[in-house]
Amino acid sequence: MRRILLSLLIAAFIGISLPQTSFAAVRTIELIEKPHQLIDGKFLNDDLATLLAPEGRIGSLVFTPAPATTRWVIDGSFLDEIAAMADGYELADETDGQGVEIAAAFLEQLKIATAGAEVTSIAFGNPDLILAKQLAPSELLFYFSYGAERVSFHIGRAVAIDKSFSNEKRSKVSGLLRKNYTINRQAISKLSTVVTAPELQLFRARLAILLSPSINGDLSERFAQSAVDGVAAERAKLRINPGKYALTSETVDVPLTLVNGFDSAVTVNLIFRASNIKVLVNDMRQITLAPNSRTQFAVPFTVVAAGATSVNAALTNSKGQWLGPSSQLALTMTLIDSRVAWFTTGAAVLLFIGAAAQTYRRVRKGRR
């Protein structure tokens, strides 16, 4: 009997001594959603506006008071989508979205709801971590860091990175779409070596969505095509305008226009590849183009022989990697021998003098 009483007293003492918070369960709220915005920026539909409303499935998580022990796990890509809505957005059917005010209210309430709570971010776009490690392990590190940067930006404070979070589902993206993802990622990675503009960093990160387990089948095809179109648009921002030129002397300065459509300055190399040896031209190194600019350069070409030729001009980074497709310069060379030129010029001068003399004689004769 004494042993039973002693055990009860010890149990009661332990229960009184331990802090009550140790028994409080930590609630985890995940703000992770399948993508509603295509890579090119348009929204598939307006379903997200309904989800973000205070009574919606996602909105209720933020607008309903949460205990202080709540842990928030957030995808920065999802918050970027909501921010895009708050700025005004367009749907894929080219109509305007109706969730601008709802999105803005959600972001403001999120700052209040997460104040003082534990917040962790996952890889931007919630990609399949196993697949991402297989296809691009270094890019996965970028997805983690960029995801934390975006979550921190939206809630106004630093957050931790959760590299262990992963969906139970696996991505079912096909082998062809995996290859397309790799090609698109490599194209944007090359551009990123010379372009530091935020819009390109965002586009680079959004490619992670292609590896998300939440998009499969027809939806993955649609996102893949959106990525292809988006990559083409990004590469076209940095280009050389094509043109046709007639060269009539041995050395000619050909005016080429280089376009930089990004919000940051870039430094590139301009290289040339002629289809034959009828013309000679040297590459131009370390050319700096101002943000959102069209810059014209006079490039000296040396004509070796008459005829027609084409020259492909391309922009590269310091490693010699092409930053986009080349532009074709169509050249027509008509060499005029210097002796023929002097003879033609002399004949023209003599004809002019003869015509002037004849006019003078007619004037004098008329006065008489």
Enumerate the predicted regions with their spans.
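N-terminal membrane-targeting/anchoring modules of bacterial envelope and secretion proteins
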Residues: 1-253, 258-259, 268-291, 295-298, ...
